[in-house]
Structure formats: structure tokens, C-alpha cells
Amino acid sequence: MIDKIISLLEKNADTNQAQKMSEYMQNRFEFAGIPKPKLKELIKPFIKETSKDNIDWNLIIELWNCKYREAQYVALEYLQKHRKQLRPDNIKELKYMITEKSWWETVDTIDAFVGDLVLMDSGLKNLMLEWSTSDNIWLRRVSIDFQQKYKEKTDENILENIIVANLGS
């Protein structure tokens, strides 16, 4: 499956667009040069084909480790489609995704998945407190943002503790 996706990215690569996309991300990542709307269209068959399957973390991690940034976007689309299958013990895979190839545009998607897990297992709030003092800025960011879709379910005490832990950081 991974080879099929990489082939799809390479067949649709646009070097001029890739350079612009890379520059926008401060040259932190290599791009194939496929804008997100086109990428979503290209991967629709893959997402549909795998939508009824069990979540495949090996595939997600392989995509995450791919050289093209668009592969990480494919992983996030796949994860979004399988979101209902997420379980609290998947926090380790999400942490990997947060701390590897980190940048705002992927981390800000993952934080909602983390939020889902914390709602399933309130014991993960302690992990969010740990992350709030991590040396990794992206774990800190997720600890601050994981509740952003909670509305009335927001735990104001934990939010306050996390914000206080990050004052001046």
C-alpha cells in the first residue's frame, strides 16, 4: 500500500510547486508539490478502500517516515477516517507523530485526536500535565490545545495548570 501511495505522489509531483511549498514551511520538509485540495482528490480512492479496515498503525508510521510531506497529510486523512477506532493506548503513536517531523500544520490536527483519547481516559490528563513541561515545544502545544473542541467539557483546572506551566516559555 505504501508503494502505491508514494507512486501516486511521485506521478503527480510538481517541482515548482514543491519548492514554493517547502519555502512556505521554512525549508523544513521535502514536498512532492501537490496542493492539499488536489491531494485529497487523489487519495479519495485509497481512503474509501481502507475506510472499513482496522486502523493500520504500521501504514501510518510508514507514511509518517516518508520523505514527502504530503505523505504525512495522507496519514492524517487516513487517521481522520479511522478516528472512531482510536483508543487511549494509541497515545504512544500520536506522541511519535507529534515529535517527529513536527510543525504546526500537522501537530494542530493531531491535538484533536489526543483530545479524543483524553475524553476516553481521564487518566491521560496527567500525561497532558507532563507534556506541558516537556522540553519538546510541540508536546507543550498539544497539552495546551487538546481541549480546544471540548466547549462545556473543558477541564478549566487542568487548562489553568497547563497555561501556568507555560507562562514565559
Per-range role (PLM):
Residues 1-169:
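Alpha-helical scaffold domains
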